[in-house]
């Protein structure tokens, strides 16, 4: 990639139909883990006009009212009015869960004496990434995109812009010079709204109250192209506007396209699924490498075979920014991080009901107390081991 370029990332609000599905799936996962931390959960959700469908594979001793969990999640998001196309009180909720396949379970359940050789729940490849563009060590375009839709939600919830509805999308284009963020070029924000708000009033309020407070002043170096509700109308939204499905916002969930993605979604999956747990571990590794000053950006790829605990491969790239060679960073990673599935669960304390909070506004780059994968507690040891 050239040193001078434009790069774009997007995010969506908690009321976006795919994020509604993600939050229902993770709310169900949390409700199960609260009673049965070793449950096997793969909870998928579909939501459409007036309808929620819950399907997947769950093996648990927990007693959970899945229908009520789904309704509560819709209520918390703000779908409490039939005008919005789905109302938590009156929507239909269908439940169709099976148990985990015994063929899969036999590969995951086996463990040796130390209990840490539990096999991976599936084959696959996962990526972790960090860079020094923000204090949170995240790419700036996805960071700003998340903050925009978070602010839309905040102003909707506190009533300052009481004509806002739950569904919204953001998109930020930055200009990079010498590989670093230089200026903001374009901001797109589309937000669902009540029928009686004029487009002129909406655009002015969105730019002044939502967008401008989020943008870093040092990146405003000329006229920014603001595109607010460019279709002119966004009354019909949420699950009524589009059918929502779990796992369809995997780039929003991660790095906004700034790093590769292995393809596996997160929400609704318990930590035995390496799609989720190994991606969290990859973020933990990459963030600690950058926090340690070993590199200004770091990408890690981890791969697994089903039923096998040890990763089939681990790759580290610092994109030429490393203070030491990539092979040495990879060696330090293997010495300081246990990337077996059960080792990850133990290292990051993942058998907790912490996942609903991850299901909107990004799984990474948020300083939430539950997000153990955002800690930089290994940075000092890595730096010392590297001799820096």
Curated annotation (Swiss-Prot):
Pfam families hit by this protein: S-AdoMet_synt_C (PF02773), S-AdoMet_synt_M (PF02772), S-AdoMet_synt_N (PF00438)
Organism placement in taxonomy: Bacteria, Pseudomonadati, Pseudomonadota, Betaproteobacteria, Burkholderiales
PROSITE patterns hit by this protein: ADOMET_SYNTHASE_1 (PS00376), ADOMET_SYNTHASE_2 (PS00377)
Residues noted as binding L-methionine in the record, renumbered to the chain: 57, 100, 242, 273
Pathway(s) annotated for this protein in UniProt: Amino-acid biosynthesis; S-adenosyl-L-methionine biosynthesis; S-adenosyl-L-methionine from L-methionine: step 1/1
Cofactor(s) essential for the protein: Mg(2+); K(+)
Species this chain originates from: Polynucleobacter necessarius subsp. necessarius (strain STIR1)
Binding annotation for ATP: 16, 167-169, 233-234, 242, 248-249, 265, 269
Compartments, as annotated in UniProt: Cytoplasm
Entry protein name: S-adenosylmethionine synthase
Enzyme class, UniProt record, top EC level: transferase
Positions contributing to K(+) binding: 44
InterPro entries: ADOMET_SYNTHASE_CS, S-AdoMet_synt_C, S-AdoMet_synt_central, S-AdoMet_synt_N, S-AdoMet_synthetase, S-AdoMet_synthetase_sfam
Catalysis: reaction(s): L-methionine + ATP + H2O = S-adenosyl-L-methionine + phosphate + diphosphate
CDD domains for the chain: S-AdoMet_synt
Coiled coil segments of this chain: none
Gene: metK
